[in-house]
C-alpha cells in the first residue's frame, strides 16, 4: 500500500509567507526559506511554494526565493504561480523544483499541460484546480465550478470535466483546492475530493480546510485523496508534523516515517 503524503503549503506574497482565509485578508507569517527548513526537518513529505500574486498581477516567479528554498530542503518540492509557458517551467525546474503547478494558465491555454509533460515528463506537471461549489446545471453538472485568479473569476467550466481533461492532456497529479474550505480550518471538501479521486487515474492532493489531524484522516480515507495539503494548522504552531502523522497512523493510514 502506497503511503499517504502530508504536504505543507507555503503561499508567498512579496517574498514573505502569507496565509489568508478564502484568498482574502492575507497576513505575513514568516520567511519562506526558514519555514521550508523547519518543515523539512520536522518530517513533511513534500513542500509546495505558491507565489499567490504572480498570476493575478502577471509577475514572474521569484526565482531567487525558489532557488534558496530548493537548496534548503531535500524532499520533493513543487512551485506554482505565474507559470504561463514552457520557458517559465524550465526556469523553475532549473532553480531546483521537482514539479511545477499550473492553474490559471492551464485554464486559459490547456496546451501548456501537454507541452510541459512532453518537455519534462508527466510527473513534473501538477494541475492546480481552484473550485467553488455552485448550483448544478447543464453547464456545471457536478455542481463544482473552476475559478481562477485567486477565486476572483468564474470560468463556467465543470471541475470533474476539467480534472479528467487535465489528465488526458498529460498532468501527472492534481492539486484540488476548495475555495469554500480554504483557510477555514473546518475540514476538507470531502464530497468534491472523492468525486475527483474516484474519476481520475492520477494522484489527487486535497487542499483547503485542514484544521485538525482528523481532517486529514477524513480526506485521505473518505475523500480517497493520495495526499493532504496543510498550512494554517502548522504555520501557527497548533500542531506539528509528527503529531499529525502519529494521528494518521492511529487511524490505520500508512504514512512515511520522519527522516532521521
From Swiss-Prot:
It is an enzyme of class 4 (lyase). It catalyses: 5-[(5-phospho-1-deoxy-D-ribulos-1-ylimino)methylamino]-1-(5-phospho-beta-D-ribosyl)imidazole-4-carboxamide + L-glutamine = D-erythro-1-(imidazol-4-yl)glycerol 3-phosphate + 5-amino-1-(5-phospho-beta-D-ribosyl)imidazole-4-carboxamide + L-glutamate + H(+). CDD domains: HisF. Keywords: Amino-acid biosynthesis, Cytoplasm, Histidine biosynthesis, Lyase. InterPro entries: Aldolase_TIM (IPR013785), His_biosynth (IPR006062), HisF (IPR004651), IGPS_HisA/HisF (IPR050064), RibuloseP-bd_barrel (IPR011060). One of its GO terms (cellular component) is cytoplasm. It is found in: Cytoplasm. Pathway: Amino-acid biosynthesis; L-histidine biosynthesis; L-histidine from 5-phospho-alpha-D-ribose 1-diphosphate: step 5/9. One of its GO terms (biological process) is L-histidine biosynthetic process. The keyword Lyase applies. One of its GO terms (molecular function) is imidazoleglycerol-phosphate synthase activity. Its EC number is 4.3.2.10. Belongs to the HisA/HisF family. Heterodimer of HisH and HisF. IGPS catalyzes the conversion of PRFAR and glutamine to IGP, AICAR and glutamate. The HisF subunit catalyzes the cyclization activity that produces IGP and AICAR from PRFAR using the ammonia provided by the HisH subunit. This is Imidazole glycerol phosphate synthase subunit HisF. It comes from Desulfatibacillum aliphaticivorans. The gene is hisF.
